[in-house]
Amino acid sequence: MRGVSDAHITAFRPVPRTGVIYVTTEAQKLGFRFGAEGWCNLGQGQPETGELPGAPPRVRDVHIDLDAQEYAPVQGLWELRESVASMYNALYRRGMPSQYSAENVSISGGGRVSLLRAAAALGTVNLGHFLPDYTAYEELLDVFRLFSPIPILLEPRRGYAFTAEELEREIVGRGLGALLISNPCNPTGRVVGGDELARWVQVARENDAALLIDEFYSHYIWRDGDDPAPMESAARYVEDVERDPVVLFDGLTKNWRYPGWRITWTVAPRTVIEAVASAGSFLDGGGSKPMQRAACAVVTEDHARRETAAIHQEFGRKRATLLSRLRALGVRFDRDPEGGFYGWGSVAALPPPLNTGMGFFRAALQEKVITVPGEFFDVNPGKRRGGRPSRFRDHVRFSFGPEAAVIDTALERIEALVRWYDR
């Protein structure tokens, strides 16, 4: 007789787990749970959420009025939409004639929900996406069948660089109507910024190709510069907020270090906002009203700058520690991360079985260290590219999102692991 775990309801397909969910599930088989003592989670996709020196105090209480027990509008509370628009104008658009308004903003209950709404609102277009990129894009790009996902390869030997000229060639040559990217890129840490990003926006404008830019790590910028609170957003290079085909996704998850609030936003021309709100009406119904109201207090220019400055100091130190100690073991980085809080390294030079992403993950897991094998970022919607080995089977994503003490302990265990297999 089949057990419950063996049962299969034929109406449902097997849904693959994203990279972080997969590694977390495997760790749970060995006793891991969030907050469990002794575990070091370098696979996590969230930053540490406690107090940081110089940052605004953490929000610890949320007051819920009686009217906040009701549904929020699908497109979000008007006052929060106004706060987001005002913050973007203050951070990126001072002195520019075209300014964002509340009508250019839609609020969602999480980053994946924001992206899901946008994907559901796309028409019958070719949608370009890069390899490697964020693992959750894989199912997102497959579940809706109106658009066709078109992969664009980035080369490790070039540090995953991609020029505006190459972008235009892809748009024109492949007939792309839209492009989905994470910037900074998760997992490589590559940042398209400054004049380069301005040219990308210009190419999109001139070719009427929508740029869908996941900017959830845009306050974690590690390029050299004098700004104590560096941020990067394509909002800075939009000429006309109603005409330029630029759609931005961000929220409190990473840049404010409030992942549990599930407050995110989409910033775009009004016609796009109307479309994603319509999609939200049948996909998710809208986000949490009390949390949106509470978010208004932290979605300000001053709060963003102070939080980013604190992140830059604390996470910058963790980044330097992680990169230097992993590099000393033989982990090779195609490029040092310019943004985000991940190191994307090749373990090919390590002793077997640590010389593949999955082998490294399995061995480190026995030492209660969680990482994410690189093959999960080889986004392959519908598994259409067949059974050939992933180009990133030798890569691992290491997070420096956790507290410094957790990172130090994890690195000590990895160092001991390499010494053991290198005997």
Where are these regions (language model features)?
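N-terminal small-domain helix-loop-helix segment of the aminotransferase-like
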Residues: 2-109, 166, 299-306, 420-423
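Generic structural signal for small/hydrophobic residues in well-ordered secondary structure
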Residues: 23, 42, 84, 105, ...
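Conserved glycine-rich beta-strand-loop-beta hairpin in the small C-terminal domain of fold type I
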Residues: 296, 312-323, 333-348
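Hydrophobic beta-strand scaffold residues
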Residues: 148-149, 211, 333, 371
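Conserved core segment of the aminotransferase class I/II
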Residues: 87, 142-143, 236-313, 320-329, ...
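Conserved core of the PLP fold type I
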Residues: 68-207, 218-241, 247, 335
